[in-house]
Amino acid sequence: MDGEGEGSGIRLSKRFAGGKVTGGSLEVDYKTKSGTAWSHSFLNQKPWHPLSYPNQRRKWIAEQTHAQHDRRAEEVAREFAQEQEFFKQAALISKKEREKIETMKAVSFMYVRPPGYDPESAKAAEYKDEKHKGQGSSTQDPVADDNVGSRPEESQGGGERTQERKKPRPKDVFGRALPTEEEFEVLKNAPRMETGIPGRVKPFAVEVRNVKCLRCGNFGHQSGDRDCPLKDAVMPNEELRLKRDDPLTAIIAHTDPSEPLKWELKQKPGLSPPRGGFDPDDPNQQIVAEDIFDEYGGFLEGSIPIEILKSMSSDKKRKSKKNKRHKKHSSRTVEETDESSTGSEDSREKRGSKKRKKLKKKSKKQYDSDSLSFEGSGSDSYRLSRRRHTKHVDPSASLKSEVYHQGNSHREKHYYDEKHQKRKEIVDRPSASSDDSDYYRSNSSRKKRSEDDYKSHHRERKQVHSNDPVSEKSQKQHYSESGKIQRVEKEHRYDERRHRYVDMESENRNRSEKKPRYDDRDSEKHHRSVKGKEKHVYEASDDPEEFSDRYRSTKKTESDSESNRRSRKKKHELSSEEEEGESRKHRYSTNRRRN
């Protein structure tokens, strides 16, 4: 013991420096006193000694917990002070702003990092875990390690590429994989953030979907999207599912394979004879050609009757003839339409002249028949008609209606309407003289000639204007002259109407002068007196022929006055037309000279 103590010396603890007690004034030198029981190598092994390792550990833990408790108390005090400050500020602001701030504060914990979270340490830990996983997979494939030497260099290069591809993808703070250039071509040569923090990108407004398709293995779309090239392709793992979900497989599973299907039973003949069952190979079920009926109810054994063949041929011939007739008729109609479309104005005038001739013939026939019926009718029928007329019709009213009718006929402009009116007037007065009728015919022929000359003159003018190139100035002059002509024509028409009105007024005055004047205002008494006079006259002249002569003479005088008026009017019209024709010829000649 002593030798050991002297040779080795006393082992001092960390609290002693150079064999002196730092805490007290006494300096004890254990080397001088050897062989004592105060050796630290012995005392440190005791559990009750403060310098023992477990006691030192407990002390350190107690110190750390105490320091952490103090730190936590400080943080709580700081938070409390902040909260009190917030409440003071909130008391000063409005109610709406206070509610907004309170709601924001209620949700603010979602955006605060969890206490004790270090992103760098977490990232490093994840990287280590991935490394361990990769090493485990390489150690688990010993066959691959054995065959490495036997592979060529190209295969080794391919393995290196696969290892490069299997590099761990960079992830964000929450452990989600970030899109890289390898997966998305859009991100090639994209600008990077200077801070080095991985951020979410949307280059050129292209949405980068950080998802992987399970069918094709590409990034940017999922298995059900349209972008996937294998959208409609049936994968091998889906074939089993489709077969399992197919209802036909379930039906086949429920049915017995030995039993025939319904459509097969329908095709095969039945076994029971009452249900139409038969054996198709049976000789009594064979169809013979002799038993087949033809269309006409006979058998096909004999030849077809000749009468049927004849009837069929005649029917066909009739049909063909009908078709030919129809075709001929249609071709004729087409030719006629072509001719009518290509026909000139001369052909139209010819047709119009033919129609006029027909109308003249008809009017002559009507006139002859009316005159015959008028002459052949007896005196009794004349008396009856005269009595009816005197009963129902007022003579003054009849005169007024005749005058009104004549005025209307003069106002009508159309040429054919005027002709028709003249024919009516001729028929209405059968006792007109032959001289008057000759005069009317000559007058109408003159009017026709003047109209034909006028039309031909207009046609020549149109042809000349279409052939000769006219300058813009001459065209303007022509338009101005045509406007003047129209004004002159309007003035002439107005003069004609005024002349007609004056003539009608003069006629009415003459008639009123011829009528017997009376001072009685009562119209009924006047009508009675007129009727009495007519009766008296008729009774005095018992002979109806004398009465008819008297009637004819009165009519003749009226017709003479009308014919004189018409002749005056026609002369006026002819003179105006001649003046217009001369003025047009003069203008036409002046235009030709200018051109």
UniProtKB/Swiss-Prot annotation:
Basic and acidic residues composition bias: residue spans: 120-133, 161-174, 256-267, 414-428, 470-539, 547-565
Region described as Disordered: 112-180, 254-290, 310-595
Keywords annotated in UniProt: Metal-binding, Zinc, Zinc-finger
Biased composition (Basic residues): 316-331, 351-364, 584-595
InterPro entries xrefs: CIR1, CIR_N_dom, Znf-CCHC_6
MF terms in GO: transcription corepressor activity; zinc ion binding
Statement: the UniProt record of this protein carries the keyword Zinc-finger: yes
ZnF CCHC-type span: 211-228
Name this polypeptide is given: Uncharacterized zinc finger CCHC domain-containing protein At4g19190
Origin species: Arabidopsis thaliana
